[in-house]
Amino acid sequence: MLCLVYLGFAARLFVASLYSDRPELSSLQRAVRLDPTNADYRNHVGRYYALVARDPATAIDPYRAAAQLNPHAARYWFDLASAYQVLGDISNQTWALEHAIQSDPATPDVAWEAANFFLVQGEDEKALHEFRVVLDNEPTMAGAAIQFCWRIHPDADILLRDVVPARPLDFYQAVGQRLACQGELP
């Protein structure tokens, strides 16, 4: 008997995964009904509303549900922040961004995306802080990050103080490697 229950449960999850791979809204909604605790399926529904139906207001609930089901996935919080941005809801966008950063505070990709959101909001200091996280954790991105930061705030003293990592040797080695690869060093 227990084996049949397990088999039924596994079959339901398998069918849900099949529905989740289809790009139609009805299939995505079926996947959510079959496996309501799967955050990915909820996020797919939100992405459908935001990107295909171009209805960011309707995307909010599925995005929020995905983020609540798995609050440690920065992607869900960024998708929610994007929907709030399109709606012009800056306070909720900032709230979602803060959760994205909390969920993954040291990953360079997360910090880079957060920095871009903050730039759009006009929050240059927060953006520079996130670029600092990028440089602290991925020195190979130093060249691109510094160029970006220079466009935001073309003041070498501020960038050295607020953006360049405390371990300058790693940073300078990464910049030197980037310049050497681009043929800008003798």
Regions of interest found by a model, annotated:
Residues 49, 84, 118, 148-149, ...:
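Residue at a conserved register position within TPR or TPR-like alpha-solenoid repeats
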Residues 41, 76, 110, 141-145, ...:
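TPR alpha-solenoid repeat register
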Residues 2-26, 30:
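Hydrophobic alpha-helical transmembrane segments in integral membrane proteins
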Residues 34-37, 71, 105, 136-140, ...:
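Short coil turns that delineate tetratricopeptide repeat
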